Amino acid sequence: EFLREADFEGHPVPPAGAVTTGGLQGTYNGILTFANVDRETVSQLLPNNFQLAPRKTNHLPNLHPVVLMFGDPTDGAFVVSPTATQPTGIHYSEMILAVPFVQKSNQSGGWHTYIVRMYLDNAAAVAGGIPYGYQKVLASVEWKGRYARVWDTLAGDYLEGDFRWGEHWYDGNAALT
């Protein structure tokens, strides 16, 4: 059972709008899975200047959601202008660990989704995240059926297990309208 917007104090931060120059774009094919984790454990994933949004309800009071995204970004391109892109040909697999319903410390209001770590199997994609401040790590990423694994040959497993992917959450095309 996923904790929802109604369970937290605050509100969504409206998107800034489309990137018209200087950004990157691509197609994301992937799976999202949610888990409720002990709030204290989740709060330790955040940097000092961020906090978990205060709870509005007593629904699952000691838990906070985390998101795991397993995906294969394709069709990567630099956004050169509002009407022109430069294809990069990049394709890779990744796993992203994110924490929704996060606020800047000592500030009420807008929620952010904090990206804790991104594991990617492409060195160029890892390097491409540096200017944006992403915590990207080069790793092997595999997800087939219910099984998923993220590992490094020297560091060992970062994550391994069988997941229950569940039902479709919503139509992604509806989010674009």
Task: For each feature predicted by the language model, list its residue ranges.
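N-terminal intrinsically disordered, low-complexity segments enriched in P/E/S/T
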Residues: E1-V19, S93-L97, A124-A125, I130, ...
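N-terminal domain-onset segments
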Residues: E1-V79
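Extracytosolic secretory-pathway proteins
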Residues: Q25-V37, I90-E94, R164-W165, W169-D171, ...
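Short N-terminal edge-element motif at the start of the domain
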Residues: S43-Q135
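Internal, well-folded beta-alpha domain core
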Residues: Q103-T177
